[in-house]
Amino acid sequence: MSGFDNFNTDFYQSSYSVDDQNQGGYGYSNTDEPYKPYGQYDYSQPMGYSAAPGMMQPQQPYTGQIYQPTPAFTPTSSQSMYSSSFEDEPPLLEELGINFDHIWQKTLTVLHPLKASDGSIMNETDLAGPMVFCLAFGATLLLTGKIQFGYVYGISAIGCLGMYCLLNLMSMTGVSFGCVASVLGYCLLPMIILSSFGVIFSLQGIMGIILTAAIIGWCSLSASKIFISALAMDGQQLLVAYPCALLYGVFALISVF
C-alpha cells in the first residue's frame, strides 16, 4: 500500500490541496463574492429572480358553494333574445311588398278616372293587385263558359312589354317594367265589370256594344291619367291613351265573343 501511495503522489504533481476547496472554487477565487460552502447560503431571497407583480398577490376568496358555484357571467335568456329579434323584423306583408292601403288608393284612382292621381303611389311596383284582378277577370269569363286564362296572361304580358318600350321612348325620366305592369293591371278593373255583365246578359247587342265602348274608354283614360302623372308627361295623355285603348280593346273582344 505504501508503494501505491507513493506512485499516486509521484504521478500527480500538483499544488492543489483539498483544504483550498472552500477558498478557490474551481478557479473563481479572484471574484468579489466567492462561492460559499454548503449550508451557508441564504435561500430566503434568491439571487437574480424577481416575481411578476400579479403572481405575488393573494388569491381572491372563493365565495360560491360546492354544488352552486358562482357563475362568471350571466347568460342572456334565449326567450328575450328571440323576442327582441322578432320585434325588430318588419311584417311579412311589408317584406313581400303588399300594402293594402296603397292597393285601396290605387283601386279608387281607377274607379274615379276624373280624379287626380298620386304619382308617388302609382310609381311603385305593386303586382299583388294586378294578379288578383287578372284572376278575377279570368274567373268571370269562366262563369260565361270561356276558359281564357292563357289568353288573359299572354295578352297582358305582350301589352305590358309594348307599353314599356313605348313609354321609355316618350318619357324623359323612364319607367320600369314592374310599374307598367302594375298600372295596366289595376286599370283592368272596369273590364271585370264588363265580363260580369256578360254573365247576366249577352254583350253582342246594341247595349253590349255601347257598354263595351264605355268600358274601353274608362280603362284607357284611367291608365293614361296615371302614366302622365307618374312620369310627368303633361299634354301627352291622348298619345298614351290610344295604345292603352288598343290593349283593352283586345280584352273586350274576349269578353264579348
Curated annotation (Swiss-Prot):
Any single GO CC term annotated in Swiss-Prot or TrEMBL for this entry: trans-Golgi network
GO biological process: endoplasmic reticulum to Golgi vesicle-mediated transport; protein transport; regulation of ER to Golgi vesicle-mediated transport; vesicle fusion with Golgi apparatus
Lumenal face residues: 146, 195-196
Topology within the bilayer: Multi-pass membrane protein
Keywords associated with the record: Endoplasmic reticulum, ER-Golgi transport, Golgi apparatus, Membrane, Protein transport, Transmembrane, Transmembrane helix, Transport
Transmembrane segments: 125-145, 147-167, 174-194, 197-217, 237-257
Location within or outside the cell: Endoplasmic reticulum membrane; Golgi apparatus, cis-Golgi network membrane
Ranges of the Cytoplasmic topological domain: 1-124, 168-173, 218-236
Principal cellular location given in the protein's record: endoplasmic reticulum
Protein purpose: Plays a role in transport between endoplasmic reticulum and Golgi.
Similarity comment: Belongs to the YIP1 family.
Protein name: Protein YIPF5
Source organism: Danio rerio (Zebrafish)
Organism lineage: Eukaryota, Metazoa, Chordata, Craniata, Vertebrata
